[in-house]
UniProtKB/Swiss-Prot annotation:
Protein known as: Glycogen synthase
SUPFAM superfamilies: UDP-Glycosyltransferase/glycogen phosphorylase
Catalytic activity: [(1->4)-alpha-D-glucosyl](n) + ADP-alpha-D-glucose = [(1->4)-alpha-D-glucosyl](n+1) + ADP + H(+)
Similarity comment text for this entry: Belongs to the glycosyltransferase 1 family. Bacterial/plant glycogen synthase subfamily.
Pathway(s) this gene product operates in, as recorded in its UniProt entry: Glycan biosynthesis; glycogen biosynthesis
NCBIfam families recorded: glgA, PRK00654.1-2, PRK00654.1-5
BP terms from Gene Ontology: glycogen biosynthetic process
GO molecular function: alpha-1,4-glucan glucosyltransferase (ADP-glucose donor) activity; alpha-1,4-glucan glucosyltransferase (UDP-glucose donor) activity
Record's keyword annotation contains Magnesium: no
EC number from the UniProt entry: 2.4.1.21
Species the sequence originates in: Xanthomonas campestris pv. campestris (strain ATCC 33913 / DSM 3586 / NCPPB 528 / LMG 568 / P 25)
Keywords, sorted A to Z: Glycogen biosynthesis, Glycosyltransferase, Transferase
Function (record text): Synthesizes alpha-1,4-glucan chains using ADP-glucose.
InterPro entries from the UniProt entry: Glyco_trans_1, GS/SS, Starch_synth_cat_dom
Length: 474
């Protein structure tokens, strides 16, 4: 059972939602995969008629909840954890419409985790038990602990999509969350409790969304205070990485958001898309390179570095189109660039799916100087559409961008390193045959979920074989 706090079919706050929509479907040819997700207002609005099929009992301060069931049009079964009190509210899965975290997030997601453990134990009245729990990020991580604390043996795989988010709560909430007093130390994190730490301790296997990120989080620079614990899991062969895939709908030959389609053998549509992007962002007609930024406008994504090198890009004849939202200070810096370089730098503060896809389909290069990146999806979307990533060599960017072949990598997260990498990109742009060869290589790079799915099948079997009571995944 795939346990998740967001799913793009219903509600999405980040890349996890895309993974939750794609990976279970990629595995259905092999397993009876079912998804468990909270019954947010947005989920219920899109679910249609929900059949009540089970119930989980209250535990400490965690309320009893009904379990609803729907079946997607492609046959994927979805279990929905129903609670008006906890989940039926406006906002994203984690924050209110004002942008502040819900104060009861610990109760909300402990309830989700406990429900998963109860389903695994066959105590929810479903008439079905999963042979493995696949848990995703801190909102679901505590399920592995609940399983073990109750004496359960269901194999648990925990996937870390971003280690920076750990689900930190005060010790004073231990009793309310149903955490045994003698077990609190297993969640200890610098004077607080961490849901994610509990999952790392108790899951049979932990994986991340890229091979390089799995290696990097075992060191202090990117371990977010959990590096020693993760290094210990790695030493026992219980930490690995699998690069995410991207959905098959990202196809420049058929994408519904594109007016002009193209392929590796017929490039003409890219020029038409570039013209559309320039018009949408108020950029002048140009024969120079077009650089896209499709990102949250936050420090982690290196947007301050882009703002620092923007004058050099413009001076060299390039143009920049930015879409995204985030930290007010960086939004203001981007707005200032558009005022300083009218017709050369344009921005859309917010997000619009169709516009983002047209940017990938029309821009020559994608700027992605992330300081850390567990996997990253934008670089793979860009490659699929023949837009070459210019990326900092970290995490999943190392695993997905072949320097000088399917994009460009720079080693240090600094403006100077980015400038030197941009010089390489400009030289490539002036060599049409090399540019075309790199675009072709990028578009042909295997990045579908079929590749990642096969690796998850192997990981499921390995996780089941090393669990306390050996189980066969089915």
């Amino acid at each position: 059972m795939f346990v998740v706090s967001e799913m793009a079919d219903f509600i999405k706050a980040g890349g996890l939602g895309d993974v939750a929509a794609a990976l279970p479907r990629a595995l259905r040819h092999r397993y009876d995969v079912r998804v468990l997700i909270p019954g947010y207002r947005a989920v219920l609005a899109r679910a249609g008629k929900v059949e009540i099929v089970g119930r989980v009992l209250a535990h400490a301060a965690l309320p009893a909840c009904d379990i609803g069931r729907i079946v997607q049009s492609d046959g994927l079964p979805i279990y929905i954890l129903l609670s008006k009190e906890l989940f039926e509210r406006d906002g994203s899965p984690y924050v209110s419409t004002s942008g502040s975290e819900f104060e009861d997030n610990a109760i909300r997601f402990a309830t989700l985790s406990h429900a998963a453990a109860q389903i695994a134990a066959g105590r929810a009245g479903l008439g079905w038990r999963p042979r493995l729990l696949h848990l995703n990020d801190w909102p679901c991580a505590l399920a592995a602990a609940y399983v073990r604390w109750s004496g359960g043996t269901t194999p648990c795989l925990l996937t870390i999509h971003n280690l920076a988010y750990q689900g930190l709560v005060p010790y004073s909430m231990a009793a309310a969350l149903g955490i045994p007093a003698e077990r609190v130390s297993e969640l200890e994190f610098y004077g607080q409790m961490s849901f994610l730490r509990g999952g790392i301790v108790h899951a049979d296997h932990v994986n991340t969304v890229s091979v390089s990120y799995a290696q990097q989080i075992t060191g202090p620079a990117q371990g977010c205070g959990l590096d020693r614990l993760l290094a210990g899991r790695a030493a026992k062969g219980a930490l690995s990485g699998i690069v995410n895939g991207i959905d098959a709908s990202w196809d420049p030959r058929t994408d519904e958001y594109l007016d002009s389609h193209f392929s590796v053998n017929h490039w003409q549509g890219r020029q038409a898309n570039a013209a559309q992007v320039r018009k949408a962002f108020g950029l002048r007609e140009s024969t120079g390179p077009l650089f896209a930024v499709v990102s949250r406008l936050v420090h982690q994504k290196g947007l301050d570095l882009i703002c620092e090198v923007a004058p050099q890009i413009v001076a060299a004849g390039g143009q920049i189109a930015v879409i995204g939202g985030g930290e007010p200070e960086i939004e203001q810096q981007v707005a200032e660039l558009t005022r300083r370089y009218p017709g050369q730098v344009g921005a859309f503060i917010g997000f619009e799916e169709g516009l983002a896809r047209r940017m990938f389909a029309g821009a020559d290069f994608l700027l992605m100087p992330s300081r850390f990146e567990p996997c990253g999806l934008s670089q793979m979307y860009a490659q699929r559409f023949g837009c070459l990533p210019i990326a900092h060599a970290t995490g999943g960017l190392i695993d997905t961008v072949d320097d000088g072949v399917t994009g460009f990598l720079f080693q240090q997260a600094s403006a100077e390193a980015l400038r030197r990498c941009l010089e390489r990109a400009f030289r490539t742009f002036r060599l049409p045959s090399l540019l075309s060869a790199m675009r072709r290589a990028a578009m042909l790079r295997p990045s579908g979920w079929d590749v990642a799915g096969k690796k998850y099948i192997s990981l499921y079997e390995r996780t089941a074989a090393t669990a306390p009571a050996v189980a066969t995944v089915s």
